[in-house]
Regions:
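Membrane-interface coil-to-helix junctions
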Residues: 112-213, 232-251, 283, 290, ...
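Active-site-proximal, structured, solvent-exposed surfaces of multi-pass membrane proteins
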Residues: 95-98, 144, 730-938
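Periplasmic/ER-lumenal interhelical loops and adjacent helix-loop junctions
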Residues: 135, 139-148, 181, 318-319, ...
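Membrane-embedded helix bundles of polyisoprenyl
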Residues: 111-115, 202-216, 223-305, 321-341, ...
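Start-transfer (signal-anchor) and selected internal transmembrane alpha helices
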Residues: 1, 63-124, 317, 321, ...
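A cross-kingdom signal targeting lumenal/periplasmic-facing segments of multi-pass membrane
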Residues: 182-187, 211, 604-753, 758-762, ...
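Extracytoplasmic/lumenal acceptor-recognition loop(s) of multi-pass membrane glycoenzymes
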Residues: 163, 536-562, 576-647, 691, ...
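Contiguous transmembrane helix-bundle modules in multi-pass membrane proteins
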Residues: 268, 287, 412-429, 438-567, ...
Length: 938
């Protein structure tokens, strides 16, 4: 009897500990062990009583002896119980640990391999010439990763970069784009394999999405659920937005964040919540902010679905812990948040005017359409939410609300959370709040993966409780979905293909219902049904992922690997030569380009750059100087000898034409000299007039206001005049009288502009500017307009590109002309109207003799830089009475600490954008200067 009781107790104990290993609830072990101990004790007590009576028949025993014997017997029985338990538990724990490890391994590998297969089917390198580079990943992120790799491997600073527009803080770029704990992976690849490094990064993040969602489901209820894990990792958001790799960190951290919130609501423990939220904010502060909003909603809905509303004291206590945990998370992530906020202060917060008015952003039927496979529409501003996460989820989500064993308040809380997320996307004002009070530029609804997460969690709950639901109810939901899909087909949505969306949806739904029938109603075929269901999910997610990437390619185009690798290899052959042979601090640019961020990957200190963490003042300065620069980007177009020399652009790389000539080479051959040539048809011209990054000038520069002038030529003349301290304007650029004629349009005047309007909307209209060269030299064009309308240009009868376009609103080099030659520039209207600023001239020529003289005078004030790195400059300079300003072409940033002769001096701002130092109080002679950079926030 004792042995039987011991065995039963051991079995109960193992079952209890099994629950503990799976659910992580040690209190269950204590209760079960106590019950087992009590049962064993009772069994032992019965046996002992019999033994005692037998002994009593032969000898007289005292109560004390009887008590001692009873305790001994009970201890012996307990020993048998726990001995059996331990022997059984040891093997069980090993099996549980092994099973859990395999489950998590597969949760990682399945989405990893499936996404790789999708890219493989798109002929990605090395199986073709494809790449993962698309949109901003192609134009921005790949260059940021290249700069990060260069800094980590070669000792650069994460605080500052000379490769963005004139130079600027780098922590903002790092905080928004590169702070993921996985970004360092790019250091494991050679720079020629940057596209493969990013592919590896995307695959790893996709695998971790599956792993973390698997951990969450295992936390809720242990077991293998590879299909549901795959639905989250390979959801439309994960596949499409993987090009914005910095957002995927929040996606894989969201399940852990939800797990931590559930733990906080159930037990009051907030350490995990603090750590996960901090990691989310550190990985990407922007999406981290959205996850903080989601945390509030999820915590409230989860708490009130699980706990009594009457215990307000408990709710207040847990909520205070949640608040304290959130504050700690913000404090832990301050090392990223503070530099990010500092970076945003350079102009991102003023980048656009946000409309906070309320309106509905989409119809709800449109939202339902986005729950289907192959429903990609666009990532452009008119795009709808990306919420597809599998037909199984769409089928089982309504089923959850029919579950009889789920309490009504849990269903209400789940419904409220879903409605809140949908309405957040649908209501414009709420959506802007989610996006940090700023309307996103393309790529809308950047938090939509949170909806997919909630949807999948509820679908999983319905799946594991499906035994409580009749199959006919599931079939009814399936029939309703079929009807909805047929209705959508009738509406003929442009982005819903009959084959790739409608038929895949119906086919997947039919196969899921068939597989579900065997899972639910045929015990003998249940395993086959589960396998069939898993296969359907894999095939559906593969097809949907492939369709999404194909549609994405049609929308915004994937870049070819060769286009990136060959361009970098070709240009790097020149830039590496220059950097190896010239150790001074200088800027370098090129007239050929792949993207505006090329300087970051080529180790060039240039002026071309594009990023969301923009410096608005520098972008405006470059635009005022005649370069192509606006919005959040600047590009080396509009280069001219005066502007280039003042900004310290010492080398200009140009491309040889197929006929052996060089593009726009006449001016360079005349003023510059060829410094480096390569075998791949590139040449680098050295500008002997390029000034240093720091040089002395007259303090009159502080009074220059570019807003007072209409054209870049006037501004550059005024700036040089102020630098020299001259009273009379130094006319480096001299205007040329022009005459304008027009055909096919009428004229009028509006707000300081001459307006040309087509007389026939379907006819041609042209405006012609005519001038005659008065002096041999280089002639330039700039036409100011506050209302630009793109036009086609012809110069002396030959096509000459466009003007007033997004990139072509800059100085144009018209070429070299002899005295008496005619310049006839014709503008053909592409729109109905054209506006040109009146009371100004549009064509100027460069006085090369005066230019030579002026630049030699300014060069005498160059600072002799003795050492420099990313955050440090040291040098010497000569000061005299005529030069009261140490002028720099370094963007103004309060993070620069400046010392002259060992004494700290305060910097001043010039031209509303550049750093300078007032040196009027210095004595004549040589002085030393030291500059160190550390953002104020650090």
């Amino acid at each position: 009897g004792t042995d039987t009781a011991a065995a039963n107790a051991a079995s109960a104990d193992v079952g209890a500990i099994s629950d503990t290993v799976s659910d992580g609830a040690p209190t269950v072990v204590t209760a079960s062990a106590a019950a087992a101990d009590e049962n064993a004790s009772k069994a032992a007590g019965t046996s002992n009583a019999s033994d005692t009576s037998d002994i009593s028949d032969t000898s007289d025993t005292s109560d004390a002896a009887s008590c001692r014997f009873s305790l001994f017997s009970r201890a012996r029985a307990r020993s048998r119980v726990y001995g059996s338990s331990c022997r059984l538990l040891t093997g069980y724990e090993d099996r549980v640990a092994k099973k859990r490890s395999l489950y998590l391994l597969w949760a990682f590998l399945i989405p990893f391999v499936l996404l790789f297969c999708i890219y493989l089917s798109r002929a990605i390198y090395p199986f073709g010439n494809g790449s993962v580079l698309i949109l901003d990943l192609n134009g921005q992120y790949v260059y940021f990763f290249a700069e990060l790799r260069n800094k980590l491997l070669h000792g650069g600073s994460l605080l500052y970069s000379w490769s963005r527009s004139l130079g600027g803080e780098f922590m903002g770029i790092f905080a928004y784009y590169l702070a993921s704990p996985l970004s360092w992976i790019v250091c494991l690849f050679p720079k020629a394999m940057m596209t493969e490094a990013i592919l590896c990064l995307l695959l790893l993040k996709m695998g971790i999405c599956g792993l973390c969602f698997g951990l969450y489901l295992h936390h809720r209820r242990p077991g293998s659920r590879y299909g549901v894990v795959l639905l989250y990792a390979m959801s439309a958001y994960g596949v499409i937005q993987s090009m914005n790799t910095m957002w995927i960190d929040a996606m894989y951290l969201l399940p852990l964040l939800a797990m931590s919130l559930e733990r906080l609501a159930d037990s009051g423990r907030f350490r995990m919540f603090t750590v996960v939220l901090a990691l989310t904010l550190l990985s990407n502060f922007y999406i981290g902010y959205m996850m903080a909003i989601f945390s509030v909603l999820y915590y409230l809905c989860y708490y009130f679905s699980r706990h009594s509303l009457r215990r307000l004291g408990r709710f207040a206590g847990c909520s205070l812990k949640a608040l304290w945990g959130g504050i700690l998370a913000v404090m832990l992530s301050a090392v990223i948040l503070l530099p990010a906020w500092y970076s945003l202060g350079f102009g991102k917060t003023e980048f656009q005017t946000t409309d906070y008015s309320f309106f509905q952003r989409f119809d709800f039927l449109d939202f339902f359409a986005k729950l289907l496979p192959g429903s990609y529409d666009t990532v452009r501003p008119e795009g709808l939410p990306v919420v597809y996460c599998g037909m199984l989820a769409l089928l089982l989500l309504p089923v959850y609300f029919f579950l009889p064993d789920v309490k009504p308040r849990r269903k209400i809380a789940a419904g409220v959370l879903l409605v809140l997320l949908i309405m957040s996307m649908n209501m414009s004002t709420a959506d802007i709040f989610w996006h940090g009070m700023s309307k996103p530029n393309w790529l809308n609804y950047r938090y939509s993966f949170a909806f997919s997460f909630v949807m999948l969690v509820l679908a999983w709950e319905a799946f594991r409780r499906s035994a409580t639901v009749r199959y006919r109810q599931i079939l009814s939901v399936g029939f309703a979905l079929v009807c909805m899909i047929v209705v959508l087909q009738k509406f003929d949505y442009e982005y819903l293909s009959d084959y790739f969306c409608i038929w895949i949806s119906l086919g997947a739904l039919g196969l899921i219902l068939a597989s579900y029938y065997f899972v639910k109603n045929r015990a003998a075929a249940k395993r086959a049904g589960v396998i069939s269901l898993s296969v359907v999910i894999v095939l559906e997610m593969f097809a949907a992922g492939l369709c999404n990437l194909s549609d994405l390619d049609d929308d915004v185009r994937f870049g070819k690997r060769d286009a990136y690798v060959s361009f970098m290899r070709r240009v790097r052959a020149v830039t590496d030569q220059i950097n190896e042979n010239d150790g001074s601090l200088f800027r370098m640019e090129k007239t050929l380009r792949r993207k505006v961020n090329d300087p970051l990957a080529l180790d060039m200190k240039g002026i071309s750059h594009s990023t969301s963490t923009l410096n608005a003042a520098v972008i405006k300065l470059l635009q005022q100087m005649g370069y192509s620069s606006r919005s959040h980007w600047s590009k080396y177009m509009g280069g001219n000898p005066v502007g280039d020399s003042l900004l310290g652009i010492k080398y200009i790389i140009e491309e040889q034409k197929t006929d052996g000539s060089f593009t726009d080479h006449e001016l360079e051959e005349r003023l510059y000299h060829a410094a480096y040539e390569t075998e791949n048809d590139l040449i680098a011209y050295e500008n002997p007039y390029a000034l240093g990054i720091l040089y002395t000038a007259a303090s009159d520069v502080l009074g220059v206001d570019f807003e007072e002038y209409t054209t870049p030529f006037e501004r550059l003349n005024a700036l040089v005049t102020a630098m020299l301290g001259e009273e009379e304007t130094v006319q480096l650029f001299r205007m040329v009288n022009t005459e304008s004629t027009y055909e096919g349009c009428s004229t009028s005047f509006a707000s300081g502009h001459k307006k040309f309007a087509k007389t026939n909307a379907d006819g041609n209209a042209t405006v012609t500017l005519s001038a005659r060269a008065t002096t041999p030299g280089e002639y330039f064009l700039y036409i100011p307009s506050d209302y630009p309308r793109e036009v086609d240009l012809t110069l002396n009868g030959a096509a000459f590109g466009t003007y007033f376009g997004n990139e072509t609103r800059c100085i144009l080099d018209l070429g070299t002309y002899e005295s008496g030659q005619d310049l006839i520039l014709q503008m053909k209207l592409k729109e109905d109207t054209l506006y040109l600023r009146n009371n100004t001239e549009y064509i100027y020529y460069l006085d090369e003799a005066l230019f030579n003289n002026v630049m030699l005078r300014l060069a005498q004030g160059n600072v002799n830089i003795t050492s420099f790195d990313d955050t440090h400059i040291a040098g010497t300079f000569e000061s005299d009475a005529s030069e009261g300003l140490l002028f720099t072409t370094i963007p103004y940033d309060a993070g620069w600490r400046i010392q002259i002769d060992g004494k700290t001096v305060a910097p001043v701002k010039t031209l509303d954008s550049l750093l300078a130092v007032d040196i009027t109080a210095l004595s004549e002679g040589e002085h030393t200067i030291t500059m160190r950079y550390l953002p104020d926030c650090l």
